[in-house]
Curated annotation (Swiss-Prot):
Its EC number is 3.1.13.5. NCBIfam families: rnd (TIGR01388). It comes from the Bacteria. The gene is rnd. The lineage of its organism: Bacteria, Pseudomonadati, Pseudomonadota, Gammaproteobacteria, Pasteurellales. Residues 239-318 form the HRDC domain. One of its GO terms (molecular function) is nucleic acid binding. Coiled coil: none annotated. Exonuclease involved in the 3' processing of various precursor tRNAs. Initiates hydrolysis at the 3'-terminus of an RNA molecule and releases 5'-mononucleotides. This is Ribonuclease D.
Amino acid sequence: MSKWDSNIPFLFFSNKKITMIKECQNPPHFRVVTDNTALLEVCNLAQQKSAVALDTEFMRVSTYFPKLGLIQLYDGEHVSLIDPLAITDFSPFVALLANPKVLKILHSCSEDLLVFLQEFDQLPRPMIDTQIMARFLGLGTSAGLAKLAQQYLNVEIDKGATRTNWIKRPLSDIQLQYAAGDVWYLLPLYHILEKELAKTPWEQAVRDDCELVLAKTHKLQERDSEKAYLDIPNAWKLNPLELSRLRVLAQWRQNVAIERDLALSYIVKSEHLWKVAKNNPRNTSEMLEMGLTENEVRVRGKEILQLLSQARRISSNDYPKSIERISEDPRYKKTIRLLQEKVNSLTPEGLTPEIVASKRTLEELIKWVWKYDCSQDKRPELLIGWRKPIGEKLVDALK
């Protein structure tokens, strides 16, 4: 085979030497880690590296919390598939997550971060997300790992095992190969993207956005059950009295879900909770008439009626405020168009407007300005990090 064979990816360095990427010459080789001693050994080796690739496989179908099925770790030499169902002492892995000298590399990491926080009460720091790196290289806002591996490494990642059961044991060879591949290719991909990013002015912006993802993960875990009613679709259509019922019902549902580790919809569907809050049924027959399932009424009906009785005793002074929708404001359409045009003109060369500001972050900024809520802890995303100079100009346009 010629050393210039186009099917073999190469890294090009400034000294003109060409280095073949080892991960592209061979399928991933790995070990399955199933005991505390082996985990300690793996993590001690990883602690000596400047960067490691991480991924997780988990299940979240009928449960409130994701069920961790596997952790993948690649330190540049060894791929370790860590079995969380077999290991009892994860302190070496937690120490690795927290080690400030080891960069943790993930791809599209928001769900992985939630799993780490839930299981280990520790986020990977420092952390960089290759999907965010790709965003600043003009590769789309949500480029998948398989797409990037194809583009930069000329390899195809088989995604056939994506939807399999990661809790059932033993894991199949296909599952293990799939899981190993995600980190096997992630590390060399990171090194390529790192070199590409160094040619741009966006290295700090990538770090800022990775920090933003970490901060959002903390906020998600700290969600207040008293505010769970705000997550119910169409809650804004209810008046304060109806919202007082919904607040009681949604808080109850979330607390039960956490206590019993059940998906929210397995207790009562959100649309049915909304109907109960709207219509205030007096008996289980009325619940059935408004569309609740027989199972919901049989298992939860009596409890729901007790909660409604409790809600009737709430003073009108303690009702939640009506939910304001920014899109209902008569100024909204003109303002959002103005800001979108402003973002287009302020977007730096090499970036797309979608990276600078989404409709959601523009609405967040409008609310912040119009409500005069200028507390630092509630500052919108557009006034944080690399976006701040642009956000400040948008604020000026709103005044």
